[in-house]
């Protein structure tokens, strides 16, 4: 037994998590989500059992999701739960709309963070952070991840809790070079502001401050999108084999960057600007003579970046009746319009990542009751 555990267990008490929590999350490929979770205690106060009612909005698309769930807190700080709701988040045929939840609760019961996930291999999900709502304002984040230098009247959508209903431009601060022109609209949980950025404003990330409150929310000031990177850089998908062995999907996303003060790409001072909408394609990762993996491993959605693998095989269309496994390049082109345009002057910014498509996992190490 460690000294840390001895100190913790000596003062361990039943978790007091009931109440309203502000939610900030991120789903790869779709961007940030913001909302709230209402937690209600169930049964014996010492049981650590709770129910949840969750509502959140995809900031970039505006879709709202409602879910209900149950959770159990182990050792005072480990939340394990399940929730059910609509298929809005992962509209993939055959993927369960039930999510599993794994969260680490802060010692003071004022915050929690972890992951909500689904999929046969737990590969689809959101990273989430919860903050208990009190009387003070909470700034969760923005729908827009970047604002351009020299541009006027750019609208930013802010999300949080306890925003002032009669906010003024003086209540919102993005730092030097960014002027808040006016408050377009304001509610306790959302605010729309119009901002102008000076041509000589410093490039980089800016904390968002509302009525003196700040958190992890930030927005990037940029001149131009210099390059993009594909995340993850190494992806993994698994072929399907009917009902017995389901497919493992792989979600890709394109992240924009601006060069830092050194003027070079791929160095430590690069500025991450955030998620952008790219055009997605697959190219051959040449490993052998006359390699043809891209024709058999599966398909990628040209707009969402979601890769759906093929079924396993053997495939009589492949040499030696081979299976449909292989590896390919996943390529993102930004903007989408330039990626589709074959004209000589269409020069999209491109990035790529490696994807390995392999056989199903024939042995699942989760116990059967975990999936229930």
Could you say what each language-model-derived stretch is?
Residues 149-213, 274-282, 288, 294-297, ...:
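Immunoglobulin-like IPT/TIG beta-sandwich domains and homologous Ig-like subdomains
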Residues 125-130, 214-225, 339-359:
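Edge beta-strands of extracellular beta-sandwich domains
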Residues 2-15, 68-72, 98-100, 104-141, ...:
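Edge beta-strand at a domain terminus
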Residues 18, 109-111, 153, 203-205, ...:
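Extracellular Ig-like/FN3 beta-sandwich strand-entry sites
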Residues 201-212, 314-345:
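A short beta-strand micro-motif common to beta-rich folds, especially ectodomain repeats
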Residues 36, 126-173, 187, 214-267, ...:
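Beta-strand/beta-sandwich contexts
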Residues 170, 259-296, 344, 365-367, ...:
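Short, well-ordered beta-strand segments
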Residues 15-104, 115-118, 123-124:
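Central antiparallel beta-sheet cores of small beta-barrel/beta-sandwich binding domains
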């Amino acid at each position: 037994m460690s000294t840390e555990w001895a100190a913790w267990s000596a003062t361990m008490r039943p978790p007091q998590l009931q109440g309203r929590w502000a939610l900030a999350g991120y789903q790869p490929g779709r961007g940030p989500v913001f909302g709230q979770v209402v937690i209600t205690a169930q049964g014996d106060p010492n049981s650590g059992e709770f129910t949840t009612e969750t509502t959140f909005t995809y900031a970039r698309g505006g879709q709202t999701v409602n879910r209900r769930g149950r959770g159990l807190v182990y050792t005072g700080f480990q939340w394990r739960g399940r929730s059910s709701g609509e298929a809005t988040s992962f509209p993939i045929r055959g993927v369960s709309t039930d999510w599993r939840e794994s969260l680490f609760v802060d010692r003071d019961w004022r915050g929690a963070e972890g992951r909500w996930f689904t999929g046969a291999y737990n590969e689809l999900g959101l990273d989430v952070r919860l903050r208990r709502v009190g009387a003070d304002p909470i700034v969760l984040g923005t729908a827009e991840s970047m604002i351009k230098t020299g541009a006027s009247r750019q609208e930013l959508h802010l999300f949080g809790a306890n925003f002032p209903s009669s906010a003024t431009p003086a209540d919102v601060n993005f730092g030097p070079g960014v002027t808040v022109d006016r408050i377009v609209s304001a509610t306790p949980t959302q605010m729309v502001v119009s901002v102008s950025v000076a041509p000589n404003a410093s490039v980089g990330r800016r904390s968002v401050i509302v009525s003196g409150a700040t958190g992890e929310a930030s927005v990037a000031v940029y001149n131009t999108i210099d390059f993009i990177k594909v995340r993850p850089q190494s992806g993994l998908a698994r072929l399907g084999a009917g009902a017995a062995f389901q497919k493992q999907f792989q979600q890709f996303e394109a992240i924009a960057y601006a060069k830092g003060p050194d003027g070079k790409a791929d160095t430590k001072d690069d500025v991450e600007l955030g998620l952008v909408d790219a055009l997605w394609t697959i190219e051959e990762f040449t490993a052998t003579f006359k390699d043809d993996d891209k024709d058999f491993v599966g398909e990628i959605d040209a707009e969402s970046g979601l890769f759906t693998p093929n079924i396993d095989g053997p495939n009589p269309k492949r040499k030696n009746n081979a299976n449909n496994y292989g590896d390919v390049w996943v390529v993102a082109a930004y903007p989408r319009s330039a990626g589709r345009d074959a004209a000589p002057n269409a020069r999209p910014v491109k990035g790529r990542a490696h994807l390995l498509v392999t056989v199903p996992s024939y042995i699942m190490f989760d116990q059967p009751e975990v999936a229930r």
